[in-house]
Regions:
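Beta-strand-centric surfaces of beta-sandwich/beta-rich domains
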Residues: 1-208
């Protein structure tokens, strides 16, 4: 499972959240993905699970450009996808919170938000989920001060929204992969997000 943890702050407008999830493969050199469930809450409008290898973006694992909270289902892939050691997966969610007047936080309630991708794969490895989240160290080194700052933002200002977006991009990312019952922690580290300058470009359609 690839997740966006509940301490992520979602600003009050439409945006995409990009969080890279590095997979802990143990002694395996690859595993095969054969199905997927992508999930967000009421503000979710689109979800894509993206795949990166050696600095290049590969075709996405799954794309849902018209996500509907009331219509969610597990989907089998038409072709199994190989994930190799060193690859990265990223769950990208687009939200529309223009009808709300206050920031939306990540969390478990329906009015909170999530950005999840439940991946079905084989062979089995003792791993339940990988999660990543910005730690907002580009805003303030003190986590308590960060929340005070975010609550004071004037989210109706385009300049404030653009500044926040840039600060998130500059923030360090906390990442961990964990096993059953939250133990053991296979990986836990802080890194800076890197995305290729050029994303995946799908081939042109041959349909008339």
């Amino acid at each position: 499972m690839l997740t966006l943890p509940n301490f992520f702050a979602l600003k009050s407008l439409r945006k995409s959240i990009r969080i890279i999830h590095c997979m802990a493969l143990g002694k395996l050199h690859e595993f095969k993905i054969f199905g997927i469930v992508q999930h967000a809450h009421l503000l979710g409008r689109a979800i894509t699970t993206r795949h990166f290898r050696n600095g290049t973006e590969l075709p996405p694992i799954a794309v849902d450009p018209n996500y509907d909270f009331d219509f969610q289902e597990a989907r089998l892939l038409r072709t199994e996808r190989s994930v190799q050691r060193g690859d990265s997966l990223m769950v990208e969610c687009t939200y529309d919170s223009t009808a709300r007047t206050t920031p939306t936080l990540g969390g478990l309630t329906t009015r909170d938000e999530m950005c999840l991708s439940f991946v079905m794969y084989y062979p089995k490895i003792p791993l339940t989920n990988c999660l990543s989240a910005p730690i907002y160290d580009s805003i303030d080194k003190d986590e308590r001060a960060v929340w005070t700052t975010l609550k004071a933002y004037n989210w109706t200002s385009p300049q404030v929204r653009q500044t926040f977006k840039q600060k998130v991009r500059e923030s360090s990312i906390h990442h961990q992969c964990i096993g059953a019952q939250m133990n053991p922690k296979y990986l836990e580290f802080v890194f800076h997000e890197y995305l290729p300058q050029e994303g995946y470009i799908p081939s042109s359609s041959t349909c008339p």
